[in-house]
């Protein structure tokens, strides 16, 4: 049992967390030296694998033709949204504000297209090579042929998800021919479950939280010798799939003449649930773009799992439920009570800090983004905007802000059905 009273004496911010007050946790280990189990070479290995699969995506998912089979999203300037936010803020955003629009990523419309799809590709390549069906120099478009569907159909892919990870893995694994099961927690949006079933995925629903769903998913995979389990709580393949985003972002920064140096720092605001995708992206940013990019996570006040884990140093050994925090949030993609086994360890020296936020403010930002920039995102994807005001006060103590650039990472949204999106916007309009 975890002695929460003793912990909260040592870390007084836990009391604020228990009262659902927004907090900023500053990482005192930021920028210290650390030995990490993966490095820049692993990022480029993952990028090369995405390149090998590009011809497959062009034939299997024609929506990727405009980007030649590469799954990437635009970097959009947010001048109107910045003006809206600054009109309400106590702490003005100085410099330029951008949206990394992973809500527009092809195939599954979320950041999970990066890590989730990558791990499926890596497994598919391994299986095809094991059976002598492909070599590295082949044109991978042939993986769309019926004989590969028959081969992959002998294998299962299993994952536990609150929604977007299941969507990305389910769509691609099923298309390749794998028997695919997605175990979903009670937080998962109905439309995500419906879409997966339409694609032929076996959706297993639980009237319980993510930790329960992923535990059951793991058990079911262990019981099937031909099943491969994708572990959102501890997979380095997922992590590295996300990290490739940094290679692509670096090129976008150059194309848009966005300077990144000591006088022009770059701040990147990433929503965190289990912490895998923002950690993978943050790792990539620090390894590829370097010391003048500063990642910051955003978490709901009702489920601050990564901040609780990192603040106490307990990481995945503590869940928000241990601290009596209810874990209820409208940000379904962030509804994970226990952080990933690798997020806290990998982020120990690479993450500037974490800001928690109020759900109502997030819903307001969903509506403001819709109204000002005509960009639709699901609630959790707006949370980078939600934390801007609070975080600026912290950043100004450490960095020159006049010429800074800020990137809010929009983690999902383009697949949201219109009725659901209209409801999110209407709810946001109600918030004063």
UniProtKB/Swiss-Prot annotation:
**Broad enzyme group:** lyase
* Modification type N6-(pyridoxal phosphate)lysine: residues: 112
What InterPro entries does its record include? Answer: D_Ser_am_lyase, Ser/Thr_Dehydratase, Ser/Thr_deHydtase_PyrdxlP-BS, TrpB-like_PALP, TrpB-like_PALP_sf
* GO BP terms in the entry: D-serine catabolic process; isoleucine biosynthetic process
Which SUPFAM superfamilies does this UniProt record tie to the protein? Tryptophan synthase beta subunit-like PLP-dependent enzymes
The Swiss-Prot or TrEMBL record describes its family as follows: Belongs to the serine/threonine dehydratase family. DsdA subfamily.
Recall the taxonomic lineage recorded for the source organism. Answer: Bacteria, Bacillati, Bacillota, Bacilli, Lactobacillales
Q: Name one Pfam family in it.
A: PALP
Q: What is this protein called?
A: Probable D-serine dehydratase
Q: Catalysed reaction(s)?
A: D-serine = pyruvate + NH4(+)
EC id: 4.3.1.18
Required cofactor names: pyridoxal 5'-phosphate
Q: Which UniProt keywords apply?
A: Lyase, Pyridoxal phosphate
Give this protein's Gene Ontology molecular function annotations: D-serine ammonia-lyase activity; hydro-lyase activity; pyridoxal phosphate binding
Determine if Lyase is one of this entry's keywords.
Answer: yes
